[in-house]
Amino acid sequence: MGLKKLAEKVEDYNARLESGKASKIRPSHVEKVLRKLRVKARDLEAEIATVSSADKKARLKGKLAIAQTHISRAEWLLRELA
């Protein structure tokens, strides 16, 4: 997700927050999700190391890339909330 799209999502969230349609995101919520994402990334890396099929390895690498993207977004959000 590009920076522009991410900024739009933050603006949308802020508008929903002001209108009472969304609850405030707490750093503890983000930290909880971040822990889960890091565990998932570690598990995927371990599975990639043991898989011999090239197709499955490629699919797992795609999942790992998505997990890493989500981790970087969660870290950004945590910095913004601090």
Language model feature labels by segment:
Residues 1-36, 79-82:
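Long, non-catalytic architectural segments outside compact domain cores
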Residues 43-44, 67-82:
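Amphipathic alpha-helical coiled-coil segments
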Residues 31-35, 56-66:
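Short, charged, amphipathic alpha-helical segments
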Residues 21-24, 51, 68:
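Residues at alpha-helix boundaries and short interhelical turns
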Residues 8-11, 35-46, 69:
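Generic structural signal for well-ordered, non-membrane alpha-helices
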Residues 5, 33, 41, 61, ...:
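Residue-level signal for functionally critical sites in structured catalytic/ligand-binding pockets
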